[in-house]
């Protein structure tokens, strides 16, 4: 029993959930934070604006923790920190990310009663979920992204260590170099695309 309690305490001291939330809000959402600093300093944000920002932070912060959601059940019922699967389905997979899409869509529709905004909130929630997988990929060396099509862990970041000789050709070397960066690019682009629907107008302004 003492060993189980110590194991649980060690698990709770691990900062991973905090890191996942902060990474999404302050790294992926850095442009959005920059966009509101001006209106915030000029006190131009209304209560409605503040409520919208809090809703986005809530959806993003919660959905980035969805891959580890089973840890709550296992701590209470099984007294373990197991959190990587629901039955045979790995939670760190694109298949399980459908839970974030569904949650984001339902919250978006409940808040705005508009299908378009519900879709954009779902995309925003999905981008939050995917940042969790990318961080775990870096830390643990892979996730089961393609389950059930491919059940073994895949690491998009380990591909960066592929040398020219290992790649076998210039094309394969360039492709391996681009993959991990492209995955991060797509996740950031999804978040920015979704935020554009909620008042964050990211446009290029020509110099006068």
Regions of interest found by a model, annotated:
Residues 1-208:
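N-terminal membrane-targeting hydrophobic helices
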